[in-house]
Amino acid sequence: MCSSDLDAAHVKHSGTARTKEEADTPVIVSHGLKLGLVSGAYGLNGSTPPKGKSWAWSDIEADHLIKRAEAAKKAGADIVIVAAHSGLEYHHEPTGEQIRLAQRLTASPAVDMVYCHHSHVVEPWTRMNGKIVMYGLGNLVAQQSSNMPGTDEGVVGRVTFTVRSGKVSTTKAEYIPILIGSKNDGPIRIHAVDTELKSGMGNQARLKSAQQDISR
C-alpha cells in the first residue's frame, strides 16, 4: 500500500512524503477539534531515500518530531499526537531509547500524546509528564507467523481529551483488546475480544488467553 492508495481511501497519513511541499505541510484531521498527526521511524529497513530527497521520510529524532508538532499547533491543531516507529520486535517491554524519546516528546507543550509501533506485540502504557504514552499496540492489519507468540494480539486505544482555554488534558484512556483471526479459517477477521467472550462467539479459549495476555 502506498500514499496514493491511502488518499483514494480518504485516509490521512504522515511520516512519508512525495514532495517537499507535502513534507512541510502539517497533517491535520478536523472533526470538531483539530487533531495534528506527526510520525517518525527509526529507519527504512535498509533502504535509503532517493538522492537529494531526505525529506521523503521522517525520522524519530526528538527535536525533529517536536519541530513538526510545533508546526502542527501553529497550523491550528488543538491536539497533536506523535507516532514513533520504534522499539524492539516481539519484545513486550519498552527499550531505553523508547523511554528517553517519550520523555523528550512529552516534555514539549506541543505534544499531547505519544504512541509507538514496530514491536508487533502489545507493550505497556504509561503517563509521562501528564500525558499518555503507549509503547506498543500489537498488530491490527498485519498477520505474521504463528511461530511468533503474541503477534496475533493487539489493542485499539481510545483516549478522551479535554481542551479548555487552549490547554489540553487527558480525561480518560481505555484499550479494546483485539485478536487477528487465522488465515487458515478463511478471510482474516479482527475479533473484539471482550465482546466475543461475552456473547460466547468464536474460540473462547483463545479469546480468554488473548485477554489475559493483553491485560497483564
Residue ranges and their predicted role:
Residues 2-216:
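Acidic, metal/ion-coordinating pockets
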